[in-house]
């Protein structure tokens, strides 16, 4: 890879990462893979390289992914009409077959292949495997009343044993966001990948949850680009949730869920930037928006970092 940095500047970059390498050695990092990083070939490659780098320097990355654009493309190719209610896709049994096929048979396989080009590290699985996730069917309130949107659910419980076994074996789990229905294990639900990643991060005792998106982070006054929030306490974020726009709200709700579940830090970062995960984890400035427990935020502020 070509770079204009001098040798001494390259050394400075590596040295800047040293305290973070020491802090995060042996820690689990759950990464929600989504947005443009899933559809741009160069960004896909960068993401895979980031996961390999994390593993090789002693961290334990765990990936959770959705696949909205790929699902929409396949439904269109198969002539299956997508209906939306209140901005949410209605998932019929026919559409659910496509969701399952695309997530576990296409998106997962592609990412596993990109990672494993660097060595036999990644293992694909879904929320169905090993009883990882259990979900409850969602009935969102639209126009003031509960609405049936089909086979869509929320993760309500996690058995992370299968993921723990893979991590202990030095593997990188790549988890597709589908899960059996808690009320009928033969029925599979499409679950929100942000929320699933948050639930898994809490279950495995992750040090960080990192969510990739297509904006720089959370803005206090969107679309004012100067209002980007670098750090925020979980209670302030909780107060903001009702007023957030529909695309950002589930991501910030996932951050709140992770912090409430004991994860020390949750981040929303711009996945359109190559190697954004490494920039967040291994640089002093970081990028995007970091969510922390209020007491953790106060402690960082008192120490000036």
Swiss-Prot record:
Q: Which domain of life is it from?
A: Bacteria
Kindly report the protein's main subcellular placement as a broad class. Answer: cytoplasm
The pathway it acts in is:
Amino-acid biosynthesis; L-arginine biosynthesis; N(2)-acetyl-L-ornithine from L-glutamate: step 2/4
Record family assignment: Belongs to the acetylglutamate kinase family. ArgB subfamily.
Q: What is the role of the protein in this entry?
A: Catalyzes the ATP-dependent phosphorylation of N-acetyl-L-glutamate.
Q: Which GO terms describe its molecular function?
A: acetylglutamate kinase activity; ATP binding
- The EC number on file is 2.7.2.8
Can you say what this protein is called?
Answer: Acetylglutamate kinase
Organism of origin is: Bifidobacterium longum (strain NCC 2705)
């Amino acid at each position: 890879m070509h770079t204009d940095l001098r040798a001494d500047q390259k050394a400075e970059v590596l040295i800047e990462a040293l305290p973070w390498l020491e802090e995060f050695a042996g820690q689990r990092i759950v990464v929600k893979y989504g947005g443009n990083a899933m559809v741009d070939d160069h960004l896909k490659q960068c993401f895979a390289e980031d996961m390999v780098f994390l593993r090789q320097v002693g961290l334990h990355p765990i990936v959770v992914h959705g696949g909205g654009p790929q699902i929409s493309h396949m439904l269109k190719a198969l002539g299956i009409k997508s209906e939306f209610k209140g901005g949410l896709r209605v998932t019929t049994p026919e559409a659910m077959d496509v969701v399952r096929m695309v997530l576990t048979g296409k998106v997962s396989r592609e990412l596993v292949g990109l990672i494993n080009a660097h060595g036999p590290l990644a293992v694909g699985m879904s929320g169905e495997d090993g009883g990882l996730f259990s979900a409850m069917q969602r009935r969102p309130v639209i126009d003031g009343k509960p609405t049936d949107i089909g086979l869509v659910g929320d993760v309500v419980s996690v058995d992370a044993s299968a993921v723990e076994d893979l991590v202990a074996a030095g593997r990188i789990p790549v988890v597709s966001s589908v899960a059996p229905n808690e009320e009928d294990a033969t029925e599979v639900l499409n679950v929100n990948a942000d929320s699933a990643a948050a639930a898994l991060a809490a279950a495995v005792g992750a040090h960080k949850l990192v969510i990739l998106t297509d904006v720089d982070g959370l803005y206090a006054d969107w679309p004012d680009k100067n209002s980007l929030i670098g750090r925020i306490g979980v209670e302030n974020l909780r107060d903001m949730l009702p007023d957030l726009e529909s695309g950002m709200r589930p991501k910030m709700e996932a951050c709140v869920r992770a912090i409430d579940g004991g994860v020390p830090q949750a981040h929303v970062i711009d996945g359109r930037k190559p190697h954004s995960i490494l920039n967040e984890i291994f640089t002093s400035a970081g990028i995007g928006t970091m969510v922390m427990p209020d007491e953790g935020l106060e402690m960082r502020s008192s120490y000036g970092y």
